[in-house]
């Protein structure tokens, strides 16, 4: 491990020598893996690192698929009054009284080319749905066609049903009539000439299953918002704290996996727009 500095994180103590073991920001910037058997202290180690990051003023995001670590960090932040002087955002899928907004189609800062975002979102959605779009070119084309259209028109996943429904030709033609991307426009021009049965065959059952997942009632309130939605780029730049509880008690396991994957995907795309010297943020 590197020589400790003011920004280094204490990992633990060497059982043989009693020496404190630290990891430096440079080492963490390369990547960090936490490995171990069940009930061997992985979550405790992560909790310790998160607490230190918050104390040091670092930006942090915790995405907890179980909710236990989320609850511990929230209680700790309350106990030590971090809510009073740090920007802390809580996303809790178990809270039925308030649905947070997250639109994975939002562009970040200087991000101009939507192609990379379309590709990454399509892959994330297909993976969670159990589909391999690399071996299913028609499925890949259909998903990317819908996602590109929603992004270019500044829509949300809630509107996907109008693009996918074979008996909604008027709505589909209205939404696709002035697409700026020439290739996407030509594809919709062709799709809009098909009869209902032909259109239904073209998109296929796999695509509909995927759209049904991302437009489920549990996710509709999250993905269906366009204003005051989560801005991962702003959280990173401002050194904010984002705590996410994806406990399946609030949503299904597949919905939890999809939301988690899209959140990680959004952070990854936002990271690509940041400069080397920007404020450190740990996911």
Description of each model-found segment:
Residues 2-17, 25-283:
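P-loop NTPase motor domains
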Residues 20:
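Conserved oxyanion/phosphate-binding beta-strand-loop segments in alpha/beta enzyme cores
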